[in-house]
Design a protein with these regions (language model features):
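N-terminal activation segment of mature serine protease catalytic domains
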Residues: 2-67, 77, 84, 89, ...
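Gram-positive cell-envelope targeting signals
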Residues: 1-7, 148, 165
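Catalytic-histidine neighborhood of serine endopeptidases
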Residues: 70-112, 120-121
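Short, conserved beta-turn/loop elements at beta-strand boundaries and strand-helix junctions
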Residues: 48-49, 60-61, 70-72, 85-86, ...
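Terminal peptide-recognition signature
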Residues: 38-43, 65, 75, 79, ...
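Active-site region of chymotrypsin-like
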Residues: 121-134, 162-188
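Short conserved beta-strand and strand-loop elements enriched in small hydrophobics
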Residues: 43, 88-96, 148-153
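Active-site substrate-binding loop(s) of clan PA
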Residues: 31, 67, 103-105, 123-157
Length: 188
């Protein structure tokens, strides 16, 4: 749980907002997103295949990942599974630009989530100082109308950013092995 930023303001009369007010709001939202970027990585997945002419070609995909753990041996990164399932090489790029080889540790086809790991011995001290393991909270306390920020690659490319609101925070869906709560936003 994060503490509110700044002081609490109680408005007793209607106020007109100026362009500068919106700019100030978005500056603060971007600052929050900037702090989260320390927990984001870019994962490059490379795979080889053969085309119709029997020529070997390599394809590369980049996706965003979230640093979710440090078990003392590896840094653990949560990513979508589909883009990496056939990869012959995985490489993680951290917020400071350092790129290191990673391995697929585990995956769940139902949720399309996977964990890749980077050997902690390969990560230098300056990179460890630049990154932060994500603080994961509980979604049980969120309400419709709460503000949300999507980071990683919500616009389809790494480093993009979107702002929005929760519209249906308690929507449930069933899958093969259970029921999941979805957080539905107004972001497109």
């Amino acid at each position: 749980n994060q503490e509110p930023i700044g002081e609490t303001v109680v408005i007793t009369e209607p106020q007109e907002l100026e362009l500068a007010d919106y700019q100030k709001l978005y500056t603060k939202l971007k600052a929050v997103a900037g702090e989260v970027n320390k927990s984001l990585v870019t994962v490059m997945a490379a795979s080889s295949d053969t085309d119709w002419f029997n020529e070997i070609y390599e394809s590369r995909r980049e996706i965003s990942g979230l640093l979710v753990g440090n078990n003392g041996v590896e840094l653990l990164v949560l990513i979508p599974y589909e883009p990496v399932k056939d990869a012959s090489l995985l490489q993680v790029t951290f917020v400071d630009g350092t790129s290191l080889e990673a391995v697929l540790k585990n995956y769940d086809r139902v949720t399309d989530l996977a964990i890749v790991s980077v050997n902690l011995a390969a990560v230098d001290d300056s990179t460890m100082e630049a990154v932060k393991i994500a603080d994961l909270g509980s979604s049980k306390s969120v309400k419709a109308g709460d503000s949300v920020i999507a980071v990683g690659s919500p616009a389809g490319f790494a480093g993009s950013l979107k702002f929005g609101n929760l519209v249906a925070p308690g929507h449930k869906t069933s899958a093969i092995d259970g029921e999941y709560r979805l957080l539905i936003t107004d972001m497109e």
